[in-house]
């Protein structure tokens, strides 16, 4: 990786409000040291993503609203510079990475931005090959983007940013849907980018993986910078202070519940080497034999029983589960490497994914009917339909999930974590007996992580089947009674 020109970033007295909304940023001042890694953290809705949109020029060139103050890159005001210049200086990995794709295949996507800047064809091929190798996704090059798992999409977005070769890279929750092995890959990539002189700004709730890489920390609250500290200071603040600041774990969490192994895919997860190792990392204790899952197999009398579930894609078997039981009255976590089939399982249960003939799913001994299962998707944008938060969910659920103050806001104007909680509120309103949540803590801060976990435990106590698909061990430790490891 070659050295990159260093860029100076500064925010001077910036206040900003999205159209029709309250101020999101209030008199923010921030300096980003060239060649350093600056971590921006804080509660959901505190303005972290908005800061990144200022730095890459999306505000005010794409997002309208009321803006005052100055955003400078190399002493040039971003708001007055041509938008195409921003693309030469900054690359961004967005919180919802699928929203930044413009083509249909991974290879085409990595070439798209350089092509727009008339980079020579041979150089584009070299950049693409290097980015694919850097993220360990060479096997995905010819894949249709629509067929990728959430974690794979995240890695493609990171590769896309690398291929642009900009001096500044902005990352908004870059590990939100990644398994532990992939998080380690992202950490290694960030380390190499930093060593090459790139200026990095990372907005994250999950911060343990950045230990030893962070130079500067900016903690935001209610649209203002409330704390600044050196990177090494953050990891010395102690547990009490960490919780007071609303930050998530500073050390890599280990799963408290011993998982039961489930061989869910014929021939393993796509035949990918190392998938079992990734699953072992996800649980901390190691994947166990499939037979260990039998003690929780159940007879389906009080829970969800799945039998002979097979799903194929493009003629290839991608999911094969002979028998699996999820008890009512408990929260079951589902872990496993990216691409192993966790989301496919969830979609099949909710009749969003066609299964082979012969599959049987029963709830309480009776056939599982449509509408009895509800899925909170990874991409929650697909589940928000109305003009206001109050139209999406009932007042009691908004109150329970700390959204009542946002009742008049448009759902798509919310932060990533707020959108996540809103869709969970709508799921509770549906009174589904099987509730499946796919990576429900993407963009969620520590306080709301604990609140969501408590809500899920309450829902389970009401007799529901609650299934949580997650790589977030910190969250699973808060809510899961049992864990299944798909390998």
Functional labels for PLM-detected ranges:
Residues 77-91, 195, 362-376:
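ABC ATPase NBD coupling module
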Residues 122-140, 394-406:
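Conserved ABC ATPase "signature" region
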Residues 144-148, 152, 410-414, 418:
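Conserved ABC ATPase signature
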Residues 158, 424:
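Hydrophobic anchor residue at the start of the ABC signature
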Residues 161-162, 427-428:
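ABC ATPase C-loop
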Residues 169-172, 435-438:
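Catalytic Walker B motif of ABC-type/P-loop ATPase nucleotide-binding domains
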Residues 204-205, 470-471:
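H-loop/switch region of ABC-family ATPase nucleotide-binding domains
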């Amino acid at each position: 990786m070659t050295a990159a020109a260093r860029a100076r970033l500064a925010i001077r007295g910036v206040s900003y409000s999205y159209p029709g909304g309250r101020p999101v940023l209030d008199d923010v001042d921030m300096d980003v040291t060239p060649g350093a890694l600056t971590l921006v953290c804080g509660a959901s809705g505190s303005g972290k993503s908005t800061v990144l949109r200022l730095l890459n020029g999306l505000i005010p060139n794409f997002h309208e609203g009321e803006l005052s103050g100055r955003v400078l890159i190399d002493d040039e005001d971003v708001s007055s510079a041509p938008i195409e210049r921003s693309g030469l200086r900054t690359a961004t990995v967005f919180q919802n990475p699928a929203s930044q794709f413009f083509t249909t295949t991974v290879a085409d996507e990595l070439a798209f931005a350089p092509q727009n800047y008339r980079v020579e064809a041979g150089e584009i091929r070299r950049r693409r090959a290097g980015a694919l190798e850097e993220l360990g996704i060479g096997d995905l090059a010819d894949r249709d983007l629509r067929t990728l798992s959430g974690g794979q999409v995240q890695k493609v977005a990171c590769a896309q940013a690398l291929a642009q070769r900009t001096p500044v890279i902005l990352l908004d929750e870059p590990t939100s849907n990644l398994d532990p092995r992939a998080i380690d890959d992202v950490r290694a990539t960030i380390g190499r980018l930093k060593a090459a002189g790139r200026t990095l700004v990372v907005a994250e709730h999950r911060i343990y993986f950045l230990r030893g890489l962070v130079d500067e920390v900016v903690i935001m609250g209610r649209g203002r910078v409330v704390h600044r500290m050196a990177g090494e200071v953050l990891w010395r603040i102690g547990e009490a202070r960490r919780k007071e600041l609303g930050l998530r774990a500073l050390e890599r969490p280990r799963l408290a519940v011993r998982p039961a192994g489930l061989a869910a895919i014929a021939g393993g997860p796509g035949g990918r080497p190392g998938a079992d190792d990734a699953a072992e990392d996800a649980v901390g204790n190691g994947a166990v034999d499939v037979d260990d899952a039998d003690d929780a197999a159940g007879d389906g009398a009080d829970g969800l029983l799945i039998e002979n579930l097979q799903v194929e894609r493009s003629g290839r078997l991608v999911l094969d589960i002979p028998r699996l039981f999820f008890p009512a009255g408990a929260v079951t976590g589902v872990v496993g490497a990216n691409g192993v089939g966790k989301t496919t399982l969830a979609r099949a249960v909710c009749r969003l994914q066609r299964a082979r003939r012969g599959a049987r799913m029963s709830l309480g001994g009776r056939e599982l009917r449509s509408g009895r299962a509800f899925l909170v998707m990874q991409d929650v944008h697909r589940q928000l339909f109305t003009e206001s938060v109050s139209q999406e969910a009932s007042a009691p659920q908004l109150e329970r999930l700390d959204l009542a103050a946002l009742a008049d806001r448009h759902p798509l104007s919310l932060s990533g974590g707020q959108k996540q909680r809103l869709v969970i509120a709508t799921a509770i309103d549906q009174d589904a007996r099987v509730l499946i949540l796919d990576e429900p803590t993407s963009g969620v801060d520590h306080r709301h992580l604990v609140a969501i976990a408590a809500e899920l435990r309450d829902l389970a106590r009401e007799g529901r089947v609650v299934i949580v698909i997650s790589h977030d061990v910190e969250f699973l430790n808060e809510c899961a009674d049992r864990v299944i490891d798909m390998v």
